[in-house]
Each structure stands twice: as C-alpha cells, then as structure tokens.
Amino acid sequence: AVDGGYGVLVDELVRRAGIRWAQVAIVQVCRAPHGWELVDDEGQRWQADAAVLAVPAPWLPRLIEGVAPRTAAAARRIEVASTALVALALPGGIPLPEQSGVLVASGERLRAKAITLSSRKWGRRGNVELVRLSYGRFGDSAETNAARSAGDEDLLEWASQDLATVFGVNVEPVDCHVHRWIDAMPQYGPGHPDLVTDLRAGLPQTLAVAGGYLDGIGVPACVAAATRAAASLVAARVAR
C-alpha cells in the first residue's frame, strides 16, 4: 500500500510530468478538424489530437455513441455491480483474529459480503484497529442493493451487527466513513476477453480506453491497460 493513499502517488505523477490537471468530468466527445473536441461538465471545450477515455464501462457509451458505435455497443454488454464500503476505526486492543479478513457466501445471514481486517492486512496506524465491510452484490436489484438503497446509518448499524456476529465485537467505533461505488464493479463473465477485443477494435485510431473493466480490476492490470492505451496513441501519431 502507498503511505498516505493513492492520491499521494497521483499528485506526484502530475507534478513530475509537468502537466495541467483539469479536475472536471468530460460529458461529450466530438470529432474536430484536427482530432477531437471534448466538452466538460462546466461547458469548456478542449481540443486534443488524441484521447484516452479512462471511465467506467457504463459511462463509455454516452461519450462515444456518435463516433464509435461498435465500441459503445460492446461496453453496454459489460455488466457491473455497485458496492458500499464501511470503514471503521475501533478502539485499540480489540481482540481480532490474525487473519486478513472474511469472505461471505451468498445466502448467509450476514449482510456484509466481505470483511477486511485492514490493520492486520496492511499494518496498524495509531492506537486503533481498522476494519472495512463491503455491502452489495452483483445481481441485487436497485431496491435491494445496499449501495443504492441503504442509508449511511443503516450501513453503520449493519456493520456493527456483522462484527458482533463474526468476531464477538461489541464496541462503538472511534471513527467511521461510508463510501459508495455505483456501477463501478465490472463483472468478468464467460467470453470477456473476446468482448474486450471487439470493444477496442471499434475505436478510431486516435481514441483509446483504459479502466478496470478491460483486463482486470487490480491496480497492476489497470496500469497495464492505461500503458497499452497510451502506447497505442503514440503509435498512431507516429504512423501519421
């Protein structure tokens, strides 16, 4: 793990690259006489010779339907799930097992799908025990998916109940945080590599894609997908 979180790494990469980082969302991608015009959510228009679209699969079709319909159609076939993460800081000295966590099978009476004992997995920070519980599974409806339908207070209550059930822990957390990832967990079903090949094949030469829905959801796989995307655009520029 990166000390201070991945934000530290991103900030340092931006600093060393000497680039301008505009923290806006792109809402439209259009062809331009010499490349592409990208419109952000503040209405500003950006000109680009080439672009890497590093967005979740559900966002991709709305950006490129008009310029890469084959890619848009392939992206729509990638199913996704939503999840809510509950991070708790428990008082130090709580008797937790020396394991990294627990995966919960569907059908169990726990609401959590996974419990990560963060202090055991990544090392302790201060006099607290950090734990993380995940809620929401692929296949949940919009009404039953915890990430979409449950409030923060409900999630915190479920987390306390699940910790008590699994570990016998009944304490008030020192601190807590709830974060939701909506439609952000791509599902790798049968034939996924062929689907990704079709998705990439439909892109214009100076557009590329990157993200966890392509070649794997882990950090190394995402870095590799981004490197591949950037390299393809460099090659396209050289070919021109």
PLM feature spans:
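Short beta-strand to alpha-helix junction loop
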Residues: 1-14, 21, 147-154
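Generic solvent-exposed, charged/amphipathic alpha-helical segments
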Residues: 10-15, 61, 65, 156-164
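A conserved beta-strand/loop element that lines the FAD pocket in flavoprotein oxidoreductases
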Residues: 16-28
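Short, well-ordered alpha-helix to beta-strand connector turns
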Residues: 17, 48-49, 204
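A structural signal for the hydrophobic beta-strands that form the central parallel beta-sheet
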Residues: 21-22, 53, 209
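Short glycine-/acidic-enriched loop or helix-start segments at secondary-structure transitions
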Residues: 25, 62-64, 188, 219-220
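Mid-domain catalytic core of redox enzymes
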Residues: 27-148, 153, 165-166
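Conserved flavin/dinucleotide-binding core of flavoenzymes
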Residues: 114-240
